[in-house]
Amino acid sequence: MKFRHFIYATLLLASCATTKDATDAAQGVIKDTHNSSVNAAQENKNRMTIKRYNTPNGFAFSLLEYITGKETQENICISPASAECALAMVANGARERTLEQILSTLNSKSLDSLNNKEIYKQPIKESGTKLTLANSIWVNKKQPVKEQFIADNKKYHNAYVSNVPFNDNTASTINEWCSQNTNGKINNIVDKLDDKTKMLLINALYLKGAWMDEFNKNATTDEPFTKADGTTTTVKMMHQTLTTSYNLDNNLRMISMPIAESYIWVWFILPRKGMSMSEAAAHLATNFNKLCKGAYHSQRVKLSLPRFSIEYKTSLKESLMALGMTDAFDKNANFGGISDKPLYIDDVMQNTYLKIDEKGAEAAAITHVSVGYLAMRPTKEPIEVKFDRPFLYVITDVMTNSILFTGQVGNPTE
């Protein structure tokens, strides 16, 4: 089985100067906006809160808890790793309390530790697995930017930097860059650019891999899936019995599907009946590492998992503010390391695409590789785990202890 996961993340900054309204925030650009945007951010600061977990990957689960708690869509896909990378780039230009809040939100002790995280430095390009991160900074040639900001992002994040006129031709160039760095899956993220736009920062994350244990497509059957509202829908349910990592507690059951030729594991998590996805995310925030360690003693599992795909687009602005990163989004922002002109973040956007099926587009001979500390002690009788109601997933890089992607599946047929 192969899965593909593509993500496009943008960071949007704005000048505090009063000019005309900004264009579509989904473009993720630095531009001039109304002061009304600043005032709205200031208002939101006082009414949005969420628990921040000082645990490994606490940032990821805080995002997941917040988004699953407020999102009306049944299927969610976010990338904490991509968000962190985009914020790490802009953090190189943040100063004083603005920088402190960014670091605190990301659970980073210092800017140096944030810039030097291993996940940024270990792209995987094996025969069956590919994980790449790409960063770019597009600067309006009329916008002055400090050389040290550019130098730091080239050094730590290998950012491609281009000083160009912001017009339709540049928009096409940016779209082509995104297409090239997402294997053609995300092609059109900028409709138009003009001189009100000052800078566009983009992080693209592309992941493709084959399961160690494929599903037999002939075993896939039409079966009912009960949605959160109690109604049912018919899904393509994949089946196999395998030896893999499994664990449970009083609140959830979780099973891992390792990706061949890598240290990437995909965890599928089934909360107990009656538990919301937001409650399950909060439980994972403080128990995920413990549950993972307990799961390293493998079990025979009879697994039933629906085939699904997700296309998702969201703003992370509200979530980040709720985590305490407030100054960056209003007139208190200090991005003096980017420019002497006052700037603040207008938005942080993500576009994601995830597809999981039995084989994938490039299914071939798969090399089975075990993680070194996985103790194989299977039980005699397989444990049955059936994902026939809403569940969570977490895609991890166990080598760097990073959460690449996470989200929920509430309707596999969407």
Locate predicted features.
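Extracytoplasmic/secreted cell-surface and envelope-processing proteins
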Residues: 98-100, 276-278, 312-314, 364, ...
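Short Gly/aromatic-enriched secondary-structure transition segments
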Residues: 102-106, 215-222, 279-286
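Detector for small/aliphatic-rich hydrophobic stretches
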Residues: 2-8, 14-166, 409, 413
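Non-catalytic, conformational "gating/processing" segments within enzyme and secreted inhibitor domains
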Residues: 73, 116-272, 294-377
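Internal alpha/beta scaffold segment
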Residues: 271-297
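C-terminal soluble interaction/assembly domains
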Residues: 347-414
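Conserved short hydrophobic interaction patches
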Residues: 105, 283-290, 319-326
